[in-house]
């Protein structure tokens, strides 16, 4: 006997019913064929490749699972992509996430849409889609940040970041906006070291139509300052500064991590401004050297 049923080109199950059956026998025959065809379809679907399996340590904390650091000296190679995107010279899937990320730049809206399925930016190694520009000296980076999916994971992170290199365990300092509204300044003081938090604040609930949260990361020598604008006010310093020394050129840029190793999510960073002549974050608004909101058009000042 051949297959009791088969999948059509449209994906439906077709049952072959022979003619001349009595009503009762025909009903039994139909039922038998239905369940046999269902088993056939299930077996075919089971053979389709699924998502890669993430190790337990890469899973976020839940009521039934404690979040833990990666194994000692665990690393994955970063995947780099040549070619500029907007203001940035290149982009990378730092830490070789199990699923590839993506990024797009819309010149009309000045928006970078960054998607990634990535375990975290924490502990001794990172995974994220990173858009970068090699720079040196004093610099500031600012951007508006939004998450298109309001129901995404609370610890997803959109970051403004300075990294010494593109390895997953690079020395780095970042300011991050989490999906649940946490904002912090954090740094990895040495390669393969644990990240330390320098300061944090909570953005609170966002009413419909609220201005996007705007963050800034400012480098002056070895001193880094977190800048924030929560409700459309001028950027201003938040929390304490942090000290970190970089050797030679570094990678400055924006990135996103879903905090879920096989689930992709998205952040949008807009009105990105890079300034190589750093203004003083602690100057009074409107004073000489004060940090100001960018013009409508995205700019780079060299």
Where do the PLM segments sit?
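Bacterial N-terminal signal peptides
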Residues: 33-45
């Amino acid at each position: 006997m051949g297959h009791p049923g088969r999948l059509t080109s449209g994906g439906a199950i077709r049952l072959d019913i022979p003619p001349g059956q009595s009503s009762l026998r025909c009903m039994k025959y139909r039922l038998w064929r239905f369940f046999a065809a269902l088993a056939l379809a299930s077996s075919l679907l089971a053979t389709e490749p699924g998502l890669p399996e993430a190790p337990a340590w890469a899973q976020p904390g839940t009521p039934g699972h404690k979040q833990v650091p990666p194994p000692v000296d665990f690393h994955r190679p970063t995947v780099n992509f040549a070619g500029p995107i907007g203001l940035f010279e290149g982009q990378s899937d730092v830490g070789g996430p199990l699923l590839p990320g993506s990024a797009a730049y819309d010149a009309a809206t000045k928006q970078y849409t960054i998607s990634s399925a990535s375990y975290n930016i924490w502990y001794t190694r990172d995974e994220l889609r990173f858009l970068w520009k090699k720079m040196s000296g004093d610099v500031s980076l600012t951007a508006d940040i939004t998450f298109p999916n309001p129901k995404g994971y609370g610890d997803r992170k959109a970051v403004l970041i300075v990294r010494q290199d593109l390895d997953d365990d690079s020395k780095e300092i970042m300011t991050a906006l989490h999906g649940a509204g946490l904002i912090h300044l954090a740094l990895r003081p040495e390669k393969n070291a644990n990240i330390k938090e320098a300061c944090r604040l909570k953005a609170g609930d966002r009413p419909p139509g609220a201005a996007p949260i705007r963050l800034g990361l400012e480098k002056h020598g070895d001193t880094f300052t977190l800048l924030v604008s929560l409700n459309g006010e001028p950027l201003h310093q938040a929390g304490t500064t942090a000290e970190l020394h970089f050797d030679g050129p570094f990678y400055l840029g924006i990135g996103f991590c879903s905090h879920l190793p096989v689930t992709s999510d998205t952040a949008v960073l807009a009105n990105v401004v890079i300034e190589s002549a750093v203004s003083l974050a602690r100057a009074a608004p409107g004073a000489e050297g004060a940090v100001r909101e960018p013009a409508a058009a995205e700019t780079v000042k060299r």
